[in-house]
Amino acid sequence: MKKILLALATAALVAACATTTSPTGRTQYVGAVPQDQLDQLGAQSFVEMKGKQQLSSNRSHTTYVNCVVQAVVRELPADQRAIAWESAVFADDSPNAFALPGGKVGVNTGIFTVARDQDQLAAVIAHEIGHVIARHHDERITRQYGAAGALQVVGGLLGARYGEGVGQAAMQGGSIAAQGLFLLPGSRAQETEADVVGQELMARAGFDPRKAVNLWQNMIAASGGNRPPEWLSTHPNPQARISEMQTRAASLVPVYEQARASGRRPACR
């Protein structure tokens, strides 16, 4: 029975891998782990993070972040809007943020030192949510681990459902922590794509897309010419990125103004 389950799991993973097109027209190879299981792993990772890392006790920070998250989420495709998005603020001075499949968003308190108003915070959050809706986590797992690595992840799910023996058999040769999978650094192509998706999302939500430029200027200044903050470490060249954001912002101002005219006027802070 165990061998049959493992064979079925392996076959399902291989069959599920597929080529698709990203929001910017880039070819992606995805599907090593089915979406519902990615969502489950995202939720699991989020629970683990909240259990291991200190959460901010500042309720105004929590309310502020949730307000921005929900404003951005309202502009997502219907299937993503249907998810109950959840956010958390971690008591960590590093200017970092993330979003996970399954509708989970985490923000460090350190981000408030560089995201100095709600529009700049929206630029951070929309960028991270952009990774989720562009299936970048799925793409990274499929590319870096393939069916063999994904099988180790699914082994944990099989173990939870069918017994520890099945799970251990599936994960022979090592284990991959769900948290590690989801926090793998993105490629520069993915980061640029998340910029494009995120800047449009924030404009449609009624946040000024020009403030994305200010955010990145603040991030560069915060690095002090030394090693960039973790959030910047795998991202494209900062100056080139700012130039691209300025160009996009000009074309997105009408989208932002239309959103504001239609009543999308976030008042998160």
Where are these regions (language model features)?
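A Zn2+-metalloprotease active-site environment signal
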Residues: 2-6, 17-269
